[in-house]
Regions:
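Short, surface-exposed beta-strand/beta-hairpin micro-motifs centered on an aromatic residue
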Residues: 2-9
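Gly/Gly-Pro-rich "capping" loops immediately C-terminal to redox-active cysteine motifs
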Residues: 94-120
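A short, solvent-exposed loop/turn motif at the edges and junctions
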Residues: 14-33
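Short, conserved, GDST-rich strand-edge loop motifs in beta-rich repeat architectures
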Residues: 96-103, 198, 205-209, 215, ...
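Extracellular beta-sheet/turn segments enriched in Thr/Pro/Gly and aliphatic residues
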Residues: 32-54
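The canonical Cys-X-X-Cys-His
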Residues: 83-94
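Beta-propeller fold detector
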Residues: 117, 158-175, 224-248, 321-325, ...
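Signature of short aromatic-glycine-proline-rich micro-motifs recurring in repeat-based ectodomains
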Residues: 134-147, 175-200, 209-211, 240-269, ...
Length: 371
């Protein structure tokens, strides 16, 4: 009734606390430690523009105009903006995306600045390929219009509501794990068939193109660790070879990505082992995948290349086992069958699977996979 509140289970550390809320301006930061009693005062935002600075990114992203029906006709715009491109990697609407960095301020128009911005870093080739190739340059048009309107003072048309009732008791913890140069594509902490597996346990991340230092987070004990994911063959290519197309506004000419494993997804099995879609070798498939092989799947549909394979990590021992595949892998999912079949996507013209029971018995991927 006195308006006091408790932040529970904080690790013993030094903290900075301040008040942030919808309709408020951030208060001054105050140093504190667990056990301290503080009197933090909220500051009502002096205007709508100040209040909007802490709105969720989606409120700002909603201001982005959509192309016309005629512009959309030849392309799959939303798929590439949302699922396959921009939204998949960037939180469109947060401060650094709804504004243009000072490094790109020397252009005559924001349209030119966005063209230059998307050439930045080791991802520049891919970003330009999507924006200028797949989407025929439309993102440049609408992103530049969006940032122009934001720069001119336009604000989101709706405002988030302040929490009420039990929602005021929700405590959210946002954790930085891995390194500033890396990113996480995905993480897993359980077997989706039985979510009690690894209960209250560690979370395992897949850093994809960025690094081979795979992060591990223990949210119960507030600790993070990592392990190095090796590859089987020395000639496995690395993303470090990907050039910096143009200097980044944040990293300059530095090549911050350096991954051979290029792990896309993790998934735990019933025993708590972590299976990764991860590269273990160069693209060229072994002979038993190709035409002339006696492998049953190769006799039906031989394959010559595989851009990513499989690996399994044993948390207790730290053992990392390679699983070669004749098909590319992307996402993975266990079946509810006696073989604990691990199905994968990303195989292009084929769908691949691994009989994990047979692989555990033999250690031989050639006899345990099919497609």
């Amino acid at each position: 009734d006195a308006g006091r509140y408790l932040i529970p289970d904080l690790p013993d550390a030094d903290y900075e606390l301040w008040v942030r809320g919808y309709g408020l301006a951030d208060s001054a930061k105050t140093a504190a430690r667990p056990g301290d009693r503080l009197d933090l005062r909220a500051i009502v935002a002096p205007d709508a523009a100040t209040a909007a600075q802490v709105y969720p990114a989606a409120y700002w992203y909603s201001m982005l105009d959509l192309p016309s029906e005629a512009e959309l006709e030849p392309i799959n715009y939303l798929m590439w903006i949302k699922n396959m491109g921009c939204i998949g990697c960037h939180q469109l609407g947060q401060l650094s995306t709804r504004t243009l960095p000072a490094a790109f301020s020397g252009f005559e128009s924001s349209h030119e600045a966005w063209i230059r911005r998307m050439q930045s870093g080791q991802a520049g080739t891919n970003m330009v390929g999507i924006a200028a190739g797949q989407l025929l340059g439309l993102p440049y048009k609408y992103l530049s219009d969006w940032t122009d309107r934001v720069a001119a003072g336009e604000l989101p048309s709706s405002q988030p509501e302040r929490p009420s009732g039990l929602a005021r008791n929700v405590v959210l913890t946002v954790r930085d794990w891995s390194t500033p140069e890396a990113y996480l594509h995905d993480l897993s902490g359980t077997d989706r068939r039985d979510p009690t597996v690894n209960g209250y346990g560690k979370l395992y991340g897949s850093p994809e193109l960025s690094t081979d230092i795979f992060p591990i987070l223990d949210p119960q004990n507030n600790t993070s660790s990592s392990f190095f994911a090796p590859v089987r063959d020395a000639d496995t290519p690395s993303t470090f070879e990907d050039p910096v197309v143009m200097p980044s506004a944040y990293w300059g000419d530095e090549r911050i990505w350096n991954s051979k494993a290029n792990s896309h997804n993790p998934m735990l099995d019933a025993t708590g082992r972590v299976w990764f879609t991860a590269r273990i070798r160069a693209d060229q498939n072994p002979d038993w995948c190709m035409e002339g092989s006696t492998h049953p799947s190769a006799q039906v549909f031989p394959t010559s290349r595989s851009g990513r394979q499989l690996a399994v990590y044993e948390p207790d021992s730290g053992e990392y086992t390679f699983v070669d595949t004749c098909f590319g892998t992307h996402h993975l999912q266990f079946a509810e069958d006696e073989n604990n079949t691990l199905w994968t996507s990303g195989g292009g013209p084929v769908v691949g699977w691994l009989n994990t029971r047979l692989f555990d018995e033999t250690g031989d991927a050639e006899v345990a996979i099919g497609w």
